[in-house]
Amino acid sequence: MLTERVSKYIKKQGLVSAGDEILLAVSGGPDSVCMLYIMHKLSREMGFSLRLAHLNHGLRAEESDRDAAYVTELASALGLPLCQQKVSVKAYQAEHHLSLEEAAREMRYAFLCRTAAEFGSAAVAVGHTLDDNIETVMLHLVRGSGTRGLQGLRPVLNRTIAGAGCLRVIRPLLCLGRAETQVYCREAGLLPRQDITNLSTEPLRNRIRLEVLPLLKTINPAFEETILRTAFIAGEEMALLDEVTSQMKAELVIRQDDVLMIEKIEMQRLHPALKRNLLRQMMEELLGGLKDIEARHIENIVQTMDKPAGRRIDLPYKLVFQVDYEHYLLGWGIDELCPYPPCQGEYRLGVGTETFLDGWVVKTEILPSPIGLDLSESSLVAYLDMDKAGTDLIVRTRAEGDQFQPLGMEDAKSLKEFMIDNKIPRNWRARVPLLISSKEILWLVGYRIGESAKVDENTRRVLRVEFRLLG
C-alpha cells in the first residue's frame, strides 16, 4: 500500500518529527494531490500537522485560476488551512532575464519560504517522484555534470532563497513512481488537474520525459532502475565528501566581513576533489546557494591558485577570488584588504641577523653553497648571490623613478610598469617591500628577484633572505 511505503520512507529518511507543521506545496496535479491525501492520513498517525500552499503562476489564464479553485476545494474538504498567492511569472521573467521555467521556480520557492517562515512550518513538502528524479539525473547529464549532478533529487534539501531566507524542503514521494500517484488518485475518486504544457516537447525536461527516456527503455528495459541505482551511489559518495569538506572548512577557513580566507599551504595539501568541494562550500556560504556557479568557475579558481600574489578573477555576482602571499581570498571588498602592513621609511639590514620592521621580521643568513637549495621555497624567501648583493642592504617601499631589472630580462624597466604588468593590485603597490643594495633593487618581495644578484654556477656564497609577517 502506498501510504505504508511513504510512511516507512519518511521514517527512514527522518523527514518529519511529531509536533512539526509541514507546509504542503499543492499545485493540483496528480503527484501533489496524492501527496496531500497520503500526508493527511499520516499526520494523524505520526502526530504532525499540515498547512497547504498554492502559488498561481498566471501562465495558463483561466486554467491557472481553476487550478487554484480546485486546491481551495481540497483544503476545505480536508479542513486544512491554505495560503494562496497569484503572481505574474512572465513579468518577473522579463525583469530578471530568466527562462520561464527558472522564473516560475524562483517565485514558487520564494513564496514557499516566506509562507513557511510566517507560520513557523518545520519544512515544505513537495511532490517529486521517482520519475522526477530520473528526469533530473538525465537533465544534468545532458547539460554536463559531475558526480554531484548524478545524485539527482535528495530526500531533504536545505535551500537558501535570495531575499526570503532558508528553507527545508522534503520529498516524501521519492519512493513512488508517477504512474502510482495517478492510480492512487483514480482509485480514491480524486480528479486532479492536468497541465497540458507537460505534453509540450519545448522544455528540455519534457523532451527527456517524452522522447529520450522511452527510447532508452527500448535499449535497456531496466534503464530507470540503473539510473536510480547510480543516483543513490552518487548521493552516498557526495554525502561523505560534503561531511569531510565541512569539517575542513570549519578548521581552515576564516571569515572577515564579506571575505573568506584560507592559508595557501593548507589548500595546496588538499586532494583536488576536496579542494573543489571546499570552494563550492565557500561560494555557497557567501552567495546563499550555487545558482549560476558552474564547473568552469571552480576550475578557473583552481588554475589561478598557482599564480603569483595579486592575481585575481571575477566571478558571478561580483564575487572575486584573489591570490594573496599566504592566503587565498574569496568574497567582496577584497580590494580593501591588503596583505602588506604599512612600511614607513628605510630599514638597514644586518647579515646573519633578524631585523624587525613595521609588521615584518626579516631574517638573513649566509649559506656556503647553492647546491641542493630549493630556490622556489616561498614567495617570501629569496636566494641571492652574496658577493653580488653586498652587505649594504636596505628595505623600503617604492619611490618615484624606481627602475627594476627582473630576473630573466636583459634591460631594466620602471618599477611601476612591472607592477602593472604583473597585476599587482593598485592598493598594494605602495606597501610592497623592496630589498635594495647600494645601487639597485635586488628583490621585489613576494614577486621577483633582480637579474643582477641571481644565483648561478659561479656563486660561492648564498644570501638567504626571508620576510615573515608579524601578528
From Swiss-Prot:
Q: Which Gene3D superfamilies did the record assign?
A: 1.20.59.20, HUPs
Q: Does the keyword Acyltransferase apply?
A: no
Which residues take part in binding ATP? Answer: 27-32
What is the main EC category here?
Answer: ligase
Q: What is its EC number?
A: 6.3.4.19
Q: Where in the cell is it found?
A: Cytoplasm
Q: What is the recorded function of this protein according to its Swiss-Prot or TrEMBL entry?
A: Ligates lysine onto the cytidine present at position 34 of the AUA codon-specific tRNA(Ile) that contains the anticodon CAU, in an ATP-dependent manner. Cytidine is converted to lysidine, thus changing the amino acid specificity of the tRNA from methionine to isoleucine.
Protein name as catalogued: tRNA(Ile)-lysidine synthase
Species the sequence originates in: Dehalococcoides mccartyi (strain CBDB1)
Point out the gene that encodes the protein: tilS
